[in-house]
Structures are given as structure tokens and as C-alpha cells.
A protein has these predicted regions:
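Acidic (Asp/Glu-rich) sequence patches and key acidic residues
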Residues: 1-151
Length: 151
């Protein structure tokens, strides 16, 4: 199991949580490959992955074997789409990977989805920082909302 996250073009993503999750599940059916070429994505996402790979090299790159000798947990697995990049990391590097992904998302103005979070947090760039745009609502609040609407 890995720690997973996704960065994406904010303009491409739906703004409400349910629609976003539908978009995410459509993207992760992996029907629009190949997914190993950074040139096929946007300039902002390309810049993000290029910098992310300085800290967490691509496990599918020719240089991966060199990094395996030092610390196999340092490698990242990158799936590169036109409007998103899905990235997986060793759980032992989750905090470091999340921190670097967030820093670079702010720098490059891309959205960030914490795939491994129980709350399904989606962050969008706003004036050089990231703000929580939406997340999964707790079951209690979903039930309360339905009751209040008479369902």
C-alpha cells in the first residue's frame, strides 16, 4: 500500500465534492494513456513533476536503481495525464511527500487532492497558497442534511 495524492489543473476540476470525485474516478480508470510522458501534460503540472522528482525520483526511470541502493522509500510512482498527475510514495515518506507536494502545488498554482486522506481533501490555489475547497462530509452531517431537506 502507498501514500497517494493527485495534483491537477484547477480549471479542469469540478468545484463541488461529489462532482470532483466522479471526475477523479473517471480519470483513474486509466483509459487515456500512455501515462509516462511529462510532455503530454500542462506546463504547470510538468514543472511540478520535474521538481517533485528531484526529491522523489521516478521509480520507473533509468536512475531509479541508483536511488534504491541509498533508500528505496525515496522513489515516487508518477502517472501523468493531460490534466492531472497521480503520485504514489512509500508510507514511510508520506509526511515528506505531502509537504513537498503541497509546497510545489503552491509554487506552480495547481490543485492538490489527498487521495489517501479519509476526508478526501481537495485544495485549490488562491493567491500563492492552497485553500481547502471541499472535502467529504461526515456521515452525521449527510444524514442531518437529508433530514432537514425532508428525505
Amino acid at each position: 500500500m502507498s501514500y497517494d495524492l493527485m495534483v491537477f489543473e484547477p480549471e479542469a476540476a469540478p468545484k463541488n465534492h461529489d462532482a470532483f470525485m466522479g471526475w477523479y474516478f473517471t480519470l483513474t480508470k486509466w483509459n487515456d494513456g500512455p501515462y509516462d510522458d511529462p510532455a503530454r501534460t500542462s506546463a504547470r503540472l510538468h514543472a511540478w513533476v520535474r521538481e517533485m522528482q528531484r526529491t522523489f525520483p521516478d521509480m520507473n526511470s533509468p536512475e531509479a536503481e541508483i536511488h534504491l541502493k541509498d533508500d528505496e522509500g525515496v522513489l515516487g510512482d508518477y502517472t501523468i495525464g493531460r490534466q492531472f498527475i497521480y503520485a504514489g510514495f512509500a508510507w514511510s515518506k508520506a509526511v515528506a511527500a505531502a509537504g513537498e507536494a503541497e509546497r510545489l502545488a503552491k509554487l506552480h498554482g495547481v490543485g492538490l487532492f489527498d487521495v489517501s486522506s479519509d476526508r478526501e481533501e481537495v485544495w485549490l490555489p488562491v493567491n500563492g497558497t492552497l485553500e481547502l475547497a471541499h472535502q467529504k462530509r461526515a456521515r452525521f452531517f449527510k444524514r442531518l442534511s437529508r433530514l432537514l431537506r425532508g428525505r
